């Protein structure tokens, strides 16, 4: 769906498609911002983004869930200047340094089947998907833990939600049939076998 919406909006194919899952937490709720341990698992619901490059310093964000499209200058993607749901993807671009100049603009179309407002980290899935896409397209070479920090900064500073980064770590490190053990003090993440079906 994201590719079809992207073609409708941009009239060309995206440079790529990226995906990140939502999560369920098994143990360690509210421990991430207190330096404790957490054990979340990624779920089989995902956010998908179709992204293309621009050369005019603009970023345009659309969604399969709405006809609304937001277009702004990348340099204006700063805390206090953006509100609503687009603060999540635009906050990621800000946290990656896009507002400092030099980064190409982007066309972004977001699709998700992660239920919004259900405690499954739909916001982190958006942040992580956009972070991985921009990391690839802008050739930033950041690792997954650095991208988790980017998502947390977007949520804390752009959106204004005082969260830890368990959700982002779960989304970036989660794999099938495994949970993600997170030491939030370091921070550090490792996968452990956790097959719900068995």
Region spans (language model):
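Conserved hydrophobic/aromatic beta-strand scaffold that supports enzyme active sites
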Residues: 40, 48-50, 179-181
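Short, surface-exposed beta-strand-loop junctions and turns on beta-sheet-rich folds
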Residues: 33, 67-69, 188
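ATP-dependent small-molecule kinase catalytic core of the GHMP/sugar-kinase superfamily
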Residues: 140-198
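Short Gly/Ser/Thr- and Asp/Glu-enriched loop/turn motifs at secondary-structure junctions
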Residues: 19-21
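Short Pro/Gly-enriched beta-strand edge/turn motifs at strand-loop
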Residues: 29-34, 153
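Short Gly/aromatic-enriched secondary-structure transition segments
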Residues: 35-42
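Anion-binding (especially nucleotide phosphate/pyrophosphate-binding) glycine-rich loop
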Residues: 1-17, 45-152
């Amino acid at each position: 769906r994201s590719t079809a919406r992207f073609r409708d909006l941009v009239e060309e194919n995206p440079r790529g498609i990226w995906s990140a899952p939502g999560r369920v937490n098994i143990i360690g709720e509210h421990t991430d911002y207190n330096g404790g341990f957490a054990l979340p698992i990624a779920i089989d619901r995902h956010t998908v983004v179709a992204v293309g490059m621009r050369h005019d310093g603009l970023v345009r964000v659309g969604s399969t869930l709405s006809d609304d499209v937001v277009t702004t200058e990348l340099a204006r993607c700063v805390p206090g200047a953006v509100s609503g749901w687009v603060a999540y993807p635009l906050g990621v671009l800000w946290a990656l340094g896009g507002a400092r100049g030099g980064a190409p603009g982007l066309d972004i179309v977001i699709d998700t089947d992660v239920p919004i407002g259900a405690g499954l980290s739909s916001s982190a899935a958006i942040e992580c998907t956009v972070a991985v896409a921009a990391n690839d397209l802008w050739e930033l070479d950041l690792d997954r833990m650095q991208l988790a920090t980017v998502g947390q900064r977007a949520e804390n500073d752009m959106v204004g939600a005082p969260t830890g980064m368990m959700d982002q770590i779960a989304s970036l490190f989660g794999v099938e049939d495994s949970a993600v053990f997170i030491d939030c003090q370091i921070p550090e993440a490792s996968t452990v076998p956790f097959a719900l079906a068995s």
